[in-house]
Design a protein with these regions (language model features):
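N-terminal small-residue-enriched
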Residues: 2-101
């Protein structure tokens, strides 16, 4: 397996995300799967970031299983959360109570 920075954890080889093991600031440089990436935004401890580019509509995979679909293109190293990840199983709502599909 290619080199990956110890500040992130890859949970399963087929995952297209990894998990931050510590708070990561915007502009942090990491090596993920042998590729050098600069984080476009901060990622809190325990949260997800993209291991590679993820296309809009593509399944986001964690623990080797799909956890939802990308609502928009997600670049490698980008923070993956409710702003760009939608559930395929239940409606996703914004803070004002509007459904976001």
């Amino acid at each position: 397996m290619p080199e990956t920075d110890r500040r992130v954890l890859v949970l399963a080889p087929e995952d297209n995300i990894c998990v931050a093991c510590q708070d990561l600031d915007a502009d942090t440089e990491l090596v993920i799967d042998g590729a050098q990436l600069r984080l476009p935004q901060a990622v809190p401890t325990g949260h997800k970031l993209a291991r590679r580019d993820i296309a809009a509509g593509e399944k986001v995979v964690k623990y080797g299983a799909p956890i939802g679909s990308a609502r928009q293109p997600i670049g490698a190293g980008a923070y993956v959360h409710t702003h760009n990840l939608g559930s395929d199983y239940i409606p996703t709502w914004d803070r004002e109570g509007r459904e976001m599909r």
